[in-house]
Amino acid sequence: MTYALEVDGVDKSFGGATILRGVAFAVEPGSTTAIVGPSGCGKTTLLRLIAGFEKPDAGTIALAGRVVAGGGWTPAHRRSVGYVAQDGALFPHATVGANVGFGLPRRARTPARIAELLEMVSLDPSFAVRRPDQLSGGQQQRVALARALAREPELMLLDEPFSALDAGLRANTRRIVADVLAKAAITTILVTHDQPEALSFAGRVAVMSAGRLAQIGTPREIYSTPIDVATAEFIGDAVVLSAHVDGGRAHCALGDVAVASNGVHGNARVMLRPEQIEVTTDGAGMSGTVVDVEYLGSEMLLGIRLDTGDGEVPERVTVRRFGATALTPGDRVGIRVLGQAVAYDI
C-alpha cells in the first residue's frame, strides 16, 4: 500500500531543546487521524513539519510515496497539503469571497467556483460579500476550510481549529467539518489537546507525550486499553488502584476484579473507567461512603471512600453515574465492577 503520509524517525529541536524524538507513523489514504496531547508535547511542531513550514533535524516525511523532507526537500507551496490554523488566519480586510479565492489559481477565481466552495462548508454563497468580522467564530473557521479546500489538497492538516469556539458552537462546527472532509474523501490530520474531540472526530488517534508518540489506535482501543497509566489518565477520567494480579483476576480495594489478558502478573496497578463502577443500593459488592459529588447535568461524578479492613488506608474512587438520582456526601452505597480492568506492571 502507498500511504498518504509516512513519517519515519523524525527528530526536531529548537535552541537546544528537543521537541520531537523518533516520531514514526503512517496514515492511509482517505482516513482521519487525530494527534492529541498536552500543550508543549510537540504536536503542532509535527504538523508544521508535515506542512513544510519547518525542516526536520533527522528522519523522513513522505506524501503519497514521495519523500518531501529528509533525503530531499519540497517547500510547502509545492506540497498538496491544506492547512487550517487555530484562528483561521483570514485576511481581515478582504471579503469572504476574496479569502476563499486566494486558494485558487487566478483564472479559477470565478463567483461560481467560490459559491461552490462555500456551499461545500454549509455556507450560503451570499456570504461571499461579507468580511470576517461580520462572521461568527464557527463561520470563520468554515471559510478557512473552504480556502484550504480550494487547492484540492491530498492531505488536510487542522491545527486545533475549534479550540477558540464555545462548547456548543465547537461541537456543531466539528461535525460540519468532519462531514465535509469525509464527503471529499480527503486524508485528514487533526491536532488537538481536547480528548473527547480527538476520540469523536477521528478513526485513529495518536497520543503524544514529551515529543514521542505513546500510542496509536482506534478511539476505542485508546480509551479502553491505554498502553500505560499516564496515557490512561490523560485520555479520560481513570480509577487507578494497587493490586495483585493472578490467574486473570486482580485483588484490589474493589475486591477481586477481572483483568484483560496482557501478560501482567504479581504486584501491579489496575485501571478502570469511572463508568465501569456501578453504584448499588442493595448492598451488593463492596461498600463505601460518598465524600463528594460533582454535578454535570446528565451525569454526576461521585467521590467514594471505600470501606477497608482494620489498619488499611482507605481508597477513594471516582464513579460516573447517569440519571437524576440524588446522592449527597455521607450517603452509604454499594459498589460493583462491570467488565475488565487493565493491568500494568509496576
Curated annotation (Swiss-Prot):
GO terms for cellular component: ATP-binding cassette (ABC) transporter complex. ATP binds at residues 37-44. It is an enzyme of class 7 (translocase). Keywords: ATP-binding, Cell membrane, Ion transport, Iron, Iron transport, Membrane, Nucleotide-binding, Plasmid, Translocase, Transport. InterPro entries: AAA+_ATPase, ABC_SmlMolc_Importer, ABC_transporter-like_ATP-bd, ABC_transporter-like_CS, ABC_transpr_FbpC, Mo/tungstate-bd_C_term_dom, P-loop_NTPase, Transp-assoc_OB_typ2. Gene3D superfamilies: 2.40.50.450, P-loop containing nucleotide triphosphate hydrolases (3.40.50.300). It is found in: Cell membrane. It is a peripheral membrane protein. The keyword Lipid biosynthesis does not apply. Disulfide bonds: none annotated. Residues 5-235 form the ABC transporter domain. Its EC number is 7.2.2.7. The keyword Magnesium does not apply. GO terms for molecular function: ABC-type ferric iron transporter activity; ATP binding; ATP hydrolysis activity. It catalyses: Fe(3+)(out) + ATP + H2O = Fe(3+)(in) + ADP + phosphate + H(+). The complex is composed of two ATP-binding proteins (FbpC), two transmembrane proteins (FbpB) and a solute-binding protein (FbpA). Belongs to the ABC transporter superfamily. Fe(3+) ion importer (TC 3.A.1.10) family. This is Fe(3+) ions import ATP-binding protein FbpC 3.
